[in-house]
């Protein structure tokens, strides 16, 4: 059975584990309709468009 040759310090152990839990920035793409950044494959929160169609009616547009 494998046995560690030396004790691994807490800082060495934690710095190794830190690579596992690293967060990545969200991948944003511009909305083709209004050019605001949005998550890919999701409805634009600004204009409500997805793949050239209105999916969400905003309150300002619905009142008109």
Swiss-Prot record:
GO terms for biological process: translation. Residues 1-15 have a biased composition (Basic residues). Residues 1-21 are annotated as: Disordered. Pfam families: Ribosomal_L32p. Keywords: Ribonucleoprotein, Ribosomal protein. It comes from the Bacteria. Disulfide bonds: none annotated. Gene3D superfamilies: Single helix bin. HAMAP family: Ribosomal_bL32. This is Large ribosomal subunit protein bL32. It comes from Symbiobacterium thermophilum (strain DSM 24528 / JCM 14929 / IAM 14863 / T).
